[in-house]
Amino acid sequence: MAVTRAAAPMVGNCSSAMLIIGRRYFSSPFTEKLRKTNRKKVIDLAAYPPKKIRNFGIVAHVDHGKSTLADRFLEMTGAVEKSSHASQMLDKLQVERERGITVKAQSCTMFHKDCMLNLIDTPGHADFSFEVARSLTATNGILLLVAANQGVQAQTVANFWLAFEAGLTIIPVINKVDLKSANVPRVVSQMENLFDFLPSEILYISAKNGTGIGDVLDAVVERLPPPKVEAHSPLRAHVFDSWYETHHGPVVCVAVHDGVISKGQRIRTYHSDCEYEVLVVGIMIPNMYEVKCLYAGQVGYLLTTMKSVQDAVIGETLYDVSDERNMVQPMPLITPTPPCIYASIYPTNINEYNALRVALYKLALNDSSVQIQHSNSTALGNGFKIGFSGHLHMEEYDANITITAPSVEYRAVIKDNQTILKKRYNGQRVIRLLDASDFPVCPSDIDHFLEPMIKLTLLLSTAYCEHVERLCVDARGEQVENNGLDTDCIMQQWRLPFAEVCMDFFDRLKRITSGYVTYNYQWDGFQKATIELLMIHINDLPIYEFSEIMPSNQIKARAKEIVKKLKEEIPRQQYEVRIKATLGQSKKALVQTVIAPVKKDFTGRLKGNFGGSGWERFCKKLSHQKKGKERMKQLGQVQIPKEAFINVLRR
């Protein structure tokens, strides 16, 4: 693919940026000198003008070796010592190390052949496509990594098109060529057919053994373009990542497009129009190291006077306070992926609510695709309704909490009647329905409903096509594309309602294909749908925690399931408990059942003596008990244990 190289202006007139290094090594010339002197080494970042900078990322399907390749880069460039490295050095989250996947985009600065290489490691799981898109905004090219034993997978295709549409230079790399199961000719053929790569463009490596790593680093220097920046222009940088440090506050990752940013400088955000002082400037190698300045084309981090976790907005443009705002050309804001799944989260201990609240808002700083709303449950107390990108995304920030069954966002379009709109809906024509409590009280007000859709890409063996097609059709799917990659592999695209796949669709998909399938899904807007409100009543009181919004064809089965579970979970009371499921506010039951009351057998106290006044005493007791239970039914509430809520809400 042709690369247009930008002219490389020299660096501006900032005092030298110095990096103080302890026992950290970069490329071999530095390594030898440091080993001889065993002293702190000063690195001048001003020695790296834009023509000596390469900002790149690694993208691939999950488990194709991105993190392992990043580890080898760090070792070969001397950023870490081989004897002391831990695997997956850029993976910091617990779920990343447990599952061997990358969730958050991580950055690291390395030095090779007198060039500064800024690596942005990216996730490969379908739930984290926003992380990939976000990291690509800071790069000028990517390494498209494909495992030789698995070939091109669904996420490989999605990542290729993300990079291609962003105009990035792409270097194809085939990993795991040392495995016995590797089929390199087949993978080369797939990359030719799908992406139009020439065999001569493809690099062959084994990240595990370190084979071919030097060739990849050389290709990054020789084949990727330098950043297109203006060193002598006023400061213009954009925020592409952020996270929260307990002792420092928000840490902001920036890519400097124009000018220089330095410690002590006062900066302003373009979109939120807030002013801050830069307290620390640094780069990641892979840990945080402080420098004096970041120059045009370089990537690093900032610590500023930002106090709130909401101040560091992803995609924000930073500029110097002395510059006129109307002279600044802002970078385009990065639009986060709309949450696909909503779930309510409650602390298992009510005393941990404040700690959970703080943790969630710190989470939102680092991941703007997460949405947070306050929630309250009669049984579970105060909590939060969270919008996530997917199931694994939910697990990413799991803690000692109760998570309810996930649901999707529906929308109700209200009839174009200004009186109704102003009186009941504050003038809003489209109402978001995140749970049963949001459902309009008057169904006659609704013109139609909308449900979220996804575009699902599947790569699977031709032997499983019939079973997979049946599964997708049952999920109300519509096939969009069907292409054969080779004699054994086929790529299908489906358009599906997300409500049909957000629960166990992918588990069933893997089961019917024996695991030989990969998938990627993308947000694909809304379309008209037929949905209903399944309302659960206990003793004629609506219980919104158990009620759900769902497609009409699923209502009956789900109603039976919930009523059955409630009968099993709710303990017997001193009075009758009636459970029923209805459509919306209708009084007609779809499914209903009764939990019989606990009986108090006082006839034993009469010792079988019903003669004389015994029978009168017996009838008197029955009358008192009946009146007492009626009074309890009117004044009291059904006691539903917390465990019952958890067991019913979890599917």
Curated annotation (Swiss-Prot):
Query: Which segment is the transit peptide?
Result: 1-26
The record ties this protein, via PROSITE patterns, to: G_TR_1, G_TR_2
Q: Recorded GO terms, molecular function?
A: GTP binding; GTPase activity; mitochondrial ribosome binding
Top-level taxon of the source organism: Eukaryota
Extract the Pfam families matched here.
EFG_C (PF00679), GTP_EFTU (PF00009), LepA_C (PF06421)
What InterPro entries is this protein classified in? EF-4, EFG_III/V, EFG_V-like, G_TR_CS, LepA_C_sf, LepA_CTD, P-loop_NTPase, Small_GTP-bd
Cellular component terms per the entry's GO annotation: mitochondrial inner membrane; mitochondrial matrix
Reactions listed under catalytic activity? GTP + H2O = GDP + phosphate + H(+)
The entry's localization annotation reads: Mitochondrion inner membrane
Could you say which residues bind GTP here?
Answer: 60-67, 121-125, 175-178
List the EC numbers from the record: 3.6.5.-
Gene Ontology annotations of biological process type: positive regulation of translation; translation
Membrane topology is: Peripheral membrane protein
Q: What is its biological role? A: Promotes mitochondrial protein synthesis. May act as a fidelity factor of the translation reaction, by catalyzing a one-codon backward translocation of tRNAs on improperly translocated ribosomes. Binds to mitochondrial ribosomes in a GTP-dependent manner.
Q: Which PANTHER family match?
A: TRANSLATION FACTOR GUF1, MITOCHONDRIAL (PTHR43512:SF7), TRANSLATION FACTOR GUF1-RELATED (PTHR43512)
Query: What family classification does the UniProt entry report for this protein?
Result: Belongs to the TRAFAC class translation factor GTPase superfamily. Classic translation factor GTPase family. LepA subfamily.
The name of this protein is: Translation factor GUF1 homolog, mitochondrial
